[in-house]
Amino acid sequence: MREVYGVGDFRYEYVEGWGKLPEGIRYLECPGVAVDGQDNVYVLTRGDHPIMVFDREGSYQGSFGQTYFSDRTHGLYIAHDNSLLVADDGIHTIQKFSTDGTQMMELGARNQPSERWGGEPFNRPTSAAIMPSNGDIYVSDGYGNSRIHVYTGTGEYKHSWGSPGIDAGQFIRPHNIAVDDNDTVYVVDRECHRIQLFDPQGNFITMWNNIHRPDAMVLWQDHIYVGELNGMGGVDDAPGLGHRVSIYDLKGNMVCRFGAAEEGEGPGQFIAPHGIAVDSHGDIYVAEVSYTIRGRHMDPPRELRSISKYRRVSS
């Protein structure tokens, strides 16, 4: 009998072996994942094939992005027009691609970070999103800043907000960003265990607390899907701290959560969720930085599972 995870309208089964690769190609690990309007799945990796493309069933279609990125690719977002935004905190850029692999734009001075905590773009940016109503680009910046930056769709700088701290409108680590159809901007503030909501100018609206190290986030229909990272140093192996998926309505009410208390590579288990996507059927794809969190510390180091699919089950 198949095992089903979740509750009510949000019930899922693990898809064994989704995303098998051709001989000689490996993920290493997957910091991001996104799905286009045709249910093609784009997986961001830290291997030699930075952006891999699969069909919905998990058949490998090819890759692109070689020579464009460092080994610290970080966030992947797909916009309403199917363009892809890729954050690379190793070279301090946000790059925009078409789904055929053509680079369309690059924001940031490659390999020239701004002053750490200085507030100027960019110092290790984490993610970017596009506002559908006007095409503006919102960037979470990230590891060396506690800041949100806004650009026009043509790449002209507009304004920024945020500073280090725990008050409303401040961030410890803005790790992911999304924009809904009402122009509300959602920012994952990972180390504060919360998601903050803003208007397009950066005015604070509200915050949702008690979300364990939210790392990944995607809007789909009238819900937000969140991947939660494991515990921090000293409690990083504690059961029940993160390594799970949570689903919220747009008022911040949790409607579903799944993920075993113990981390792992089995069905229903996660190690380090870092990217999340949902296709037109409601199936969930979870990308993980399992090598960074666990695999590189093993003796000898080894690659761990870093992409998985959960198929939505009809009630």
How does the language model describe each region?
Residues 1-315:
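Eukaryotic scaffold repeat domains enriched in small/polar residues
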